[in-house]
Amino acid sequence: PWKMHRQDLSPLLEDPKSKRIAPAMLVHTGKIYGSVTAQIPAADDPKLYHGPGVPWYVMLAEGRYKYVRNLIKDEMEELYDLDRDPEELTNLALDPLHAKRLVTFRKKAITELHRTKAPFAANMPRPSTLKE
């Protein structure tokens, strides 16, 4: 019933050292899908969380970096250097040296959400790290 978005990964399987053309995105909305996700539940609504308290989030990985945005108002964004920090212990989102990269990843994630027509793309809560 919902449109699926995909990329052909066969070039990566044929040559694991080849580079992905597009970033990888994961959208976690628990067990809620499609048009029902147009309205993001409030922070105190159990529908926002899945399993052991994991909220809705958007993750975008490209190259050595991974960006995570929890869909809770005033929640901090996350940015990790997966080469230097594969366990994702050091959040670079507040590091001034990575400010431009954070803005770039934020914009790429929003662009990809609009491209794939994610119903909640226009209603995302403002993160605490947004300084624009």
Each PLM stretch: what is its role?
Residues 85:
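Intrinsically disordered, low-complexity polar regions and short flexible loop motifs
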Residues 18, 72, 92-132:
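Long, internal low-complexity/basic segments
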Residues 1-78, 131-132:
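C-terminal cap/loop subdomain of S1 sulfatases and analogous C-terminal strand-loop tails that border
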